[in-house]
Regions:
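Positively charged n-region of N-terminal signal peptides that target proteins for export
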Residues: 1-4
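Mature extracytoplasmic domains of secretory-pathway proteins
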Residues: 54-98
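Generic marker of residues within folded, mature protein domains
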Residues: 13, 43-45, 69, 89
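Bacterial N-terminal signal peptides
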Residues: 6-15
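N-proximal, solvent-exposed amphipathic alpha-helical segments enriched in charged/polar residues
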Residues: 19-51, 59-61, 133
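Polar/charged, Gly/Pro-rich intrinsically disordered segments
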Residues: 92-134
Length: 134
């Protein structure tokens, strides 16, 4: 599994460069629901030809979490407008794109039962993400 990090510890960088945007702010992604979503990382699994894009979405957790039905359109949007454009330069597209939202950072593969996580799978077809039963 190959990992690309999009989120990191930014306090020192922010303190050293006041008035400049941080990498975290630059990785914020606008979604239809309007909830704050930040690109966290992507993981390539060559064995299954799957690219996973993971996003931090704090509002799916907490006291009044957004449910799966409310954020499902966001996941489609993230696949179509965030994931696919980042795969465009490859000779071969992955067979499957998995979009995941997590309320807090979670190590890949960790079930973390106390942290809400939502997942959807898509196949890249004709320039769009086609939903796949997961």
């Amino acid at each position: 599994v190959t990992r690309v990090i999009g989120f990191g510890i930014l306090a020192l960088a922010a303190a050293m460069a006041p008035g400049q945007t941080t990498a975290q702010e630059e990785s914020a992604v606008v979604v239809p629901s309007g909830m704050p979503v930040i690109f966290y990382d992507s993981l390539w699994d060559s064995a299954s030809s799957t690219e996973r894009f993971r996003f931090l979405a704090p509002r799916i957790g907490g006291d009044m979490p957004m449910d799966f039905a409310a954020v499902s359109p966001d996941m489609q949007h993230l696949c179509d407008s965030f994931a696919l454009p980042r795969l465009g330069g490859r000779d071969k597209l992955p067979a499957l794109i998995v979009i995941s939202l997590m309320a807090e950072p979670v190590a890949f593969g960790d079930p973390a039962p106390g942290i809400p996580q939502y997942f959807e799978a898509y196949s890249p077809k004709g320039g769009i993400c086609a939903w796949e039963a997961f």
